[in-house]
Amino acid sequence: LALEEFGSKAHTYSPAYTEQDFPEIMRCSSHITFNSLAQFQRFYPMVLAEGSGISCGIRINPEYSEVETELYNPCAPGTRFGITADLLPEVLPQGIEGFHCHCHCESSSFELEHTLQHIEEKFSHWFSQIKWLNLGGGHLMTRKGYDTEHLIRLLQGLKSRYPHLQIILEPGSAFTWQTGVLTSEIVDIVESRGIKTAILNVSFTCHMPDCLEMPYQPAVRGAEMGANGTFVYRLGGNSCLSGDYMGFWSFDHELRMGERIVFEDMIHYTMVKTNMFNGIHHPS
């Protein structure tokens, strides 16, 4: 998408590459980060043979993250992501030009500050051998109250300590934070044992999976979470999965078929996690 829509090759990372996919990965990438030394050793000869100057790096694990939800914590004990300092050789293999680290999720600059302390403590020994340091995503710099001046000071300080390093950030959600809603329509209202469910023409498991996996609680326009109001409903998805629902929400009026239900600030996940489970249509 970066290449086709923006005309720019991507900084690419995957927990594991396959020989079938790797030629296309190289075509679309300016930088490729490997999750393990074994993956680097397997595919680096292909990078050399391709000869387009792709810069290769390795993902590191500083064994520190302030992400509280285990599902989103890339540095949880036993994580499959990245290499710990004790497993890196004193001299990096020829061809490794950078370190990539991803430790954040909708995080502040102060969490980045703490993470940098751990990265420098454990990995700065190798900084003289690399050209770039990618600090990954999860930096929610567009959220109200984010201290951008503190972020600038952090990055300037890091650059002053290691002037030869190119410092890279990959904010993701920050680009789409509070920029789009998911609008659904009530197609039926059912009741079972006193529980009313408004069935929608969208699906939590297909279109909003984080609501079930986290669970992330979306804001619903014109409703309050909880069962304390007069007009209380579950919101149900239109798939066969029994757990494809969320609730309860209290509305200020009785819902009716054809009414629109608006989920606030959903664009950053509905864009990338849709699927055709049950033949459910993608959001338009």
PLM ranges: what are they?
Residues G7-S8, C28, G51-S55, Q94, ...:
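Short coil/turn connectors at secondary-structure junctions
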Residues H102-H104, L133-T142, P171-S173:
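Glycine-rich beta-strand-to-loop/alpha-helix junction loops that act as flexible
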Residues T33, G57-R59, H100, N134, ...:
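Structured core elements
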Residues L151-L169:
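Polymerase palm active-site segment centered on the conserved acidic dipeptide of motif C
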Residues I60-P62, G137, F204:
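Short, small-residue-rich loop/turn micro-motifs
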Residues Y64-E66, C105, M141, F175, ...:
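Feature marks short, surface-exposed loop/turn motifs that line or immediately flank catalytic pockets
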Residues L1-W132, Y146, L154-G157:
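Active-site-proximal beta-alpha core segment in soluble small-molecule metabolic enzymes
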Residues L154, I168-S284:
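Charged (often Lys/Glu-rich) extended helix/loop segments that serve as interaction or gating elements
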